[in-house]
Amino acid sequence: MNHDNPKPDGNAELIVFDFDHTLYDGDSGSDFFYWLLQRNFWRKGLALLVTPLVAPLVAYLPTRRRALNVYIWIATLGLAKNEGLDHLIKTYVQQHQTDIQQRLLAPALAVFEQHRREGEQVVVATGAPPQLARAILELAQQSAFPVLGSILLPSWGALRLSRHCHHEEKMRMLRECGYADIAIAYSDSHADLPLLKAARKPVVVNPKAAREALFRQVLPEGTPLLNWGCKKRGGVRI
């Protein structure tokens, strides 16, 4: 399952949450794939070998997906089906349950749950695999809502990133699923500016301190910049 997207409720306000550094203190996808790379010495060694060439490319949007695919291919070599990925995600979450639960941001989850109680259509849109975000949120007893995430497909005996739910592609994926009229969007990242700009009310949470000026410049005056518990991030603490 790459995402779970029931038809939008036309009578409900649409609320979109990013996941990493918004609901969760960390980069869940990177942590998961790092764990996969550490499973045996040859994966770790091969990843270290390519890192000087590949790692700098991750920082740039035009080359980010291709660079990530190198690591994903190494991490999943021998795993040619998403069913195998689902099993590894379940194992990863079980083995790291205590740490993961500590990373879930209580103020964020309170806002998330409030929107759901009020009958609004809540969607999570993340650059991580959707199965991973869903498994993590289930630890907080949050389920039965749409999760859109990056799509992995079989490739040469491993998996590759077919669609990265990131930047403009995140908005394309939301629109394809019928989630276009966004009332409120929550995100930490300047890469989500297309999402934040599309929302009638953008809310920036846990931004990097160096990005706060950019958000104030390009988003509507009065846009909240909040901190929901990421100690190393900026925003007004609540």
Where do the protein language model's features map onto the residues?
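Active-site neighborhood of HAD-like aspartate-dependent phosphohydrolases
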Residues: 2-64
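General structural signal for secondary-structure boundaries
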Residues: 41-43, 63-64, 79-87, 93, ...
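Short, surface-exposed acidic
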Residues: 43-48, 82-83, 144, 224-226
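N-terminal-biased segments
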Residues: 62-70, 147-151
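Amphipathic alpha-helical interaction elements
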Residues: 25, 77, 203-204
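Metal-dependent phosphoesterase signature
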Residues: 69-107
